[in-house]
Amino acid sequence: MTGPLSIFYFLILIFSIIVHEVAHGIVAEREGDPTARVLGRITLNPLKHIDWFGSIILPAILILSNAGFVVGWAKPVPYNPENLRRGNKSVALVAIAGIIVNLSLALIFGLLLRVLVTQGLATAAIAEIASIIVLVNVVLALFNAIPLAPLDGFRFLSAVLPRRAERTMRFIEQYSIPLLLLFIVFGWRVVAPFAFTVYSALTGIPI
């Protein structure tokens, strides 16, 4: 991926990551914790969210190396679980908020692309940009759903599983970072079938 397309991909990825993080802060605030608001993190200003490795360096390396899929992350939006009104239920809602937003973006632009293509209104540029938005957000949702710390999937499971699962979750957390790095390098074969299936279901365009 080179030229203008890689720039669009990068910008869409950054925007999608930021929206993902803002969603955590908004839900935390609605559940009783204003920490993200107080720290100025409920904003689309990228300077408030960018993690230099996760938001810039890693995505750039993956894009320039034509990796099978591109992921990234921003600085986590902080929240105080002690302020949440409904305990673990609130924690679970905060954890899953980013994934829901990414899937919502994929759904909106996937259906938009489907309509435009069906009606013959999609130019090549519009179709390309909409396709990137859908695929980026599907991949981000799937990536964040992985049950490895510090991803949302791990946080969600930690909140909803019974107390007897704590030892298992601590064991997973202990080895999460090396497993996550291995997944980023070799995990495309696992993600691709799911990502392409969801993409095709939303857009009506087979891959």
Residue ranges and their predicted role:
Residues M1-I207:
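Hydrophobic transmembrane alpha-helices and their immediate loop junctions
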